[in-house]
C-alpha cells in the first residue's frame, strides 16, 4: 500500500501549482503527501513523483523511496528527451501520448507503469496545452496510488529517438513563411521566457501571442 509520498519540483517551473494540487488530492485520499522544491527536502517513503524536474537525481535521492516516477509526454521509447509536447506540435501531432515511468540512470528509459493521451484540437497555445499537461500529470499520479496493487510495469520496446532541448533561438520566426505555416511554432512559444521573434533590416522584433475573444 502507498502511504508516504513526496512530490518534487526542483525549479521555478510553471507546473508548481499543479504539483501543489496533486499534494492536496493525495492528502484527501488520507495519504501523507508533501511537496519538496529541493532534492534534499525529499522524504524517505513509498513514492516520489518528479514533476518538471531539471536536475539529475543522484542514487542517494532515488534510494529514499521505493518508487521514483516521472511523467513523460511521448510514445516511449520514441521521443525521449526535452519538451516532447512542443516538438510533437511542431510535427503536426494532436494526439500526445503520456507515460508514467520509473526514474532510472538512463534518460527516460524506465519501465512504463501507466499511459494516457492528451488530445489537442490544433489551436491550443502554450498556456492551454500546459494546463492539459498539468492535469494529466495529476491524473496519472493519483491513478498510480489508487491502482498500485493491480499494476504491472512494462519494459520499453521499439525504436528509440530523442528530442533535443529547446532554446530561445528556436522561437525565431522565418519571415519567408506564411502566417499559417508559422502557427505551429507560435503555439509553442512562451511570451515571457522564450517569445517569438524575427529579424528584419538589422532589427530584432518580438511578437507576443494570445487568443483574442
Model-predicted segments: where are they?
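One-carbon transfer enzymes
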Residues: 1-213
Amino acid at each position: 500500500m502507498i502511504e508516504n509520498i513526496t512530490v518534487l519540483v526542483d525549479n521555478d517551473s510553471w507546473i508548481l501549482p499543479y504539483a501543489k494540487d496533486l499534494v492536496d488530492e493525495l492528502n484527501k485520499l488520507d495519504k501523507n503527501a508533501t511537496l519538496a522544491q529541493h532534492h534534499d527536502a525529499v522524504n524517505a517513503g513509498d513514492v516520489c513523483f518528479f514533476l518538471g524536474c531539471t536536475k539529475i537525481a543522484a542514487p542517494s535521492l532515488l534510494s529514499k523511496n521505493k518508487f521514483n516516477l516521472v511523467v513523460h509526454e511521448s510514445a516511449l521509447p520514441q521521443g525521449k528527451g526535452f519538451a516532447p509536447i512542443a516538438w510533437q506540435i511542431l510535427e503536426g501531432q494532436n494526439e500526445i501520448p503520456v507515460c508514467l515511468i520509473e526514474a532510472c540512470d538512463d534518460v527516460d528509459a524506465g519501465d512504463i507503469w501507466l499511459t494516457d493521451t492528451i488530445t489537442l484540437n490544433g489551436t491550443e497555445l502554450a498556456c492551454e496545452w500546459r494546463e492539459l499537461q498539468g492535469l494529466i500529470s495529476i491524473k496519472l499520479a493519483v491513478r498510480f496510488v489508487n491502482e498500485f496493487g493491480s499494476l504491472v510495469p512494462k519494459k520499453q520496446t521499439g525504436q528509440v529517438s530523442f528530442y533535443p532541448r529547446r532554446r530561445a533561438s528556436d522561437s525565431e520566426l522565418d519571415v519567408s513563411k506564411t502566417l499559417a505555416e508559422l502557427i505551429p511554432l507560435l503555439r509553442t512559444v512562451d511570451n515571457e521566457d522564450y517569445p517569438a521573434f524575427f529579424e528584419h533590416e538589422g532589427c530584432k522584433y518580438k511578437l507576443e501571442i494570445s487568443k483574442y475573444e
